[in-house]
Structures are given as structure tokens and as C-alpha cells.
Amino acid sequence: MRFCEGSIETRVPSFDGVPLDVNVALPADSVADAPFPLIVRMHGYNGTKDGPYLGGDRGPSTYTMYTDAGFAVMTFTARGRGASCGTDASRRATPEACARGWDHLGDARRSIRDVQYLSGRLVDAGLVEPAIGVQGGSYGGGRGLLLATLRDRIQQPNGHYTPWTSPEHGIDMEVAAAVPFIAWSDLTYALAPNGRALDYAIGSDTLSRAPLGVLKLSIVQGLWRQGQAHYNAPPKSDPSIDLSTWFDAFPSTAPLTETSRHAAREFTRHHAAIGVPLDRPPAPTLIANGFTDDIFPVTEALRWVHRVREAFPEATIAQLYGDFGHRRANQTSAALLAPRALTWFQRHLQDAEASAPAGVEAFVQSCEGGFGARHHADTWRELSAGELRLVDSTGTTVRSDAEHRRVSRLIDPPSGRSPEIPSSSCRRAHRAPAPGTASYTFAPVGRTVTLMGSPTIVATVTVRAAHHALIVGRLWDVDPDGKTRTLITQGIARPPSAAQETGGATPFVLQLYPNAYPLADGHRAELQLLGRSTPYVRPPTDPFEIQIERVDIRLPTVETPVKEPAGKDQNAAAVSVPAPRVLPPDMRWAPGYDPSDR
């Protein structure tokens, strides 16, 4: 390949003059063969143009995977990081240009505009085609999904959308292929979920803010610590990205403030694909999220897919899910994603007859290392055919002060960095008692059952709280001896505000993060509901109690209902026909889920 490496001295001024540190790699072919199809690779939150990228790529391998296949590749350090005004040295070199070159955390009006402007410069130079590809993970993935959804539009500083054209010659441009992985679609919901998202329904545009959710504290604290190395806007200096103020603006149980509402609006409207108006289909997108990624779970992908499919049923989307992503995930996505990404770009940027991914691929979690069985279907719904179901009306109370702290720390996603806690998606813990929490234990399964999808809890609750309450759900795999259990998945929600206002019993639907998990013969599923989970969830500042009067727990399975043969344990948990889904009054069915269509 031919490689142009940027430096502080050769930075490229962006659309607003902020200097950006850029690398460009071209295939070894003659320049006479230009223009080449371009792939923009975008780094993660704590990275720079040098990576790390997918699979920990740094150095030449960042580029050669694609340049060897005839693509041009551009990488650059996002504004406010590294030599793009992030270091003291870079700001001293160009103090005026860097004065407001702080981190904008994927804002479509600036961070995304940088990608569009830089690639437009290469188009104007005649080096690359105006239909580009984008790829990135985590922070790069969130930006990639936003670019795919914008497709051929720019979001101006005033929030309006205009056609995307190259800066000098006005050539029409678009994203023609995107591979975002372990990404968010709604940054507000990803970092502070309220539990209203359902994998079979679509909510209003304010779903993630009504009510405002509960902060994933250990995650956001970790990001904030890493972000101290960036150039951040001084407090109160930029209302579009006031991170230092916003960090404390997501309370757990205290009253909400206008600052918290403003932060949530900014994140959803300008930092997230879910906030982009869908007046055209997105670019062909291969989206990949991790079942065991407790930062950006599969929920983030499904919300975007359902929204797009509702508006554009024929949109080109492929989905890939498995045990990869941010901790506690096993972080081994390269073997799955790299070859699929290459064929995706070959198909959509080079018109090659490549066998590109299609439909939904889901790999079962394996505690033995690597990936478990592969399942494929045309849609998310078709991956599961039955369910394990448990209904309990005995009633119990969940308190805001109750948890087993050691267990909570053990399953906290970033805790895998600690020497005493293995970095594994299969977090195991003793079945420690925790008074003030609720547990619901299924009968043991009589054969191995593959859980596939989002565990669903339909509950009737009464909340007693001065302001707000929260609830954490954990689904466990309990060993046959009943002493040890493995975390399958978890989730966070706010119980309905109506219950807080009236003190009366209110129906509530909560889904935990989706997973594909093998529940072995003789093992039991166990749901635990708590009022706190420290340090993953910001602890309550005001006491509350949640009276759970009835729960209907549904665990979707790959297996279909079958009549167990004579001699089988008739007390074993059996796969049944899925019960009718419950649609909250402020939501509508996602494509393929409306019972009246069947």
C-alpha cells in the first residue's frame, strides 16, 4: 500500500478550522487507477487514529486488510483527542484553531461532520469515490451507525439537515455501506436506561427520556476517567457538550432537573442514530452487538432495526450477535466480524459477487471458550419458538437498601479488570441470601434448553417512594446442587411513574438484555429483582419500597414445545407455546409482531 501519515505539522483543518490528525492509505495500484472506494475506520472512545481497532488492530494491519482488496482507508483522531487538539502540544501548536476544538462525543453537528468533510476532501482530490464505507466499534460504532442513518445528509449547527456534498466541487456524497459494531443507537438509553424498550415494540421519540433512566454508574465513571485525557469543554462554556456538568445530572432517585432533561435531549437528538429523522432508508448496514455487553447490549441494535424496518421494510440490514463487546463480554469479535465486514464492503462498494451476510446470525454463549452454536433466521422474532414460563402471585417487597455487595461487585461489567475477578462473560457466584430482594426459581429443565432473546417480566407493582424508584433484574443459571449460579443477563428499569404518583398497583413490562444461553439438563433459571446493584447502577439517594404483587416471567427459547415422553420428570420445566405479548398503551408493535397480521 501507499501510506500518508499525518502529524501535528500536517493536520487537516476541518469544516470549522479545527485541525485534525489524519492518515490515508491507498492500494499499491497506480494513482491512475483512482478513484478508489473509501472505507473510514473510526476508533473507540479511548483511542486515536492509531487504534486500537477491531481485534486490537494497530499499525499496518489497520489498513492492509482493505488496501489489499482494492480499498482506500482513512483513519483520523477525533477532535479533542490526541493530536487533534487533545494534547497540550497540539493545542500549543495552533492555539487559535484549537480554542474550541474540544471533544464533542459523536455530535452529528461536529464529530460526524468531521468524517463527512475529510472524506469530501479526498473526493475533491479525485482519490476516492463519493459513495463511502464506514466502520467502527464502540465510540466508532455509535458514529458509524449515525453516519449510516444520515446517509447523504449533514446536520448543521442549528439542527437542520442539508444535502452532503464535497466541500470544493459540490459532488453529491453518501455512505453506501456501514459496519457499526458494539455501538449505541440511543446514547441516553444506553447509559441511563429506563427499561421501557421492548424487543417486540416501538415507542415514541421520547421513550428514553420519559421517564429519565438510571445511570450505569461504573460504566460512566470509567468513561469519565478515561475522558480526562481528552480536551473537554470547560464547565458551562458549551451547552451542546457540557460533560462535566451532565455527569452529575442523572440522579438515581432524586427529583429530575432541567439540566438532566437537557442532557438527555442533547444525547438523543444529536449524538444518536435513533434521533435522525427517517425520511430515507439508511445505508446498507451490517450491525453487530454483543449479548454479554452490558454497556451497549443487543437492545441498542434491535431498537434501530425495528425503527428502520417500520419505515423501510426492504432496507438492507444484516445483524450479528454473540458473546463479544465491552466487559463482561469475551471481546473476541474479530474472528466473526472481520471476514463479514470485508464481504459487506466488497458487495456494496465494489459491486462484487461476494456472499454478504443476510438476516440475523446469533451465536450461543459458551463458558468453555469461543462461541457456541450458530443460529440463523430472517428476523429476530424467528430465532425463538417457545418459552419457559413462571407465574408467581405470592407477593414480596424489594427495598432500596438491599443487595449482596460482593455479588454485585462480582458481576459489575468493568470488574473483570480486577485481579481477583476473571475477565469472563460467565460470572459465577455463590447463592448468597439477600433479604429485601425478590427471587423466583424455575423448576430444573429436563433437557438442555437454549434461551434465545429478551427475558420478559410482566409484573404488577406498588411503589412507595418520595420521588423515584429503580429496579434491577438478574437472570441466573443455578447449578443442580443449588449452591452456585452463573449470570445469564441483567437489566435496569424505573417502575411506572403512575405508581409513584398514586401509590396504587400498576402493571409493568420489563425486559432484561437479550442473550443466547444454554441452560443445561438439571439446571434451573432464577430471576432476582433488587432495588440496587452497586457499583453498576447509581445507588439510590432516597429510600423506596416496591411491592411486587404478581410476576409473569417468560424466557424465550430456540426449542419448540414438545410433549415429554413417558418416564421423563413431569415436574421439570417444560418449553411451552409463547404467551401473548403485552403491549404498553404508549407503544406500537414492531414489524412482524402485530397479532392481527397473523
Enumerate the predicted regions with their spans.
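Short beta-strand/loop motif that positions the catalytic acidic residue
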Residues: 281, 287-289, 293
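Glycine/threonine-rich phosphate-binding loop and adjacent beta-strand/alpha-helix elements that clamp
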Residues: 6, 10-11, 352-598
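Alpha/beta-hydrolase fold nucleophile elbow
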Residues: 126-139
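Conserved alpha/beta-hydrolase "acid-adjacent" motif
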Residues: 294-302
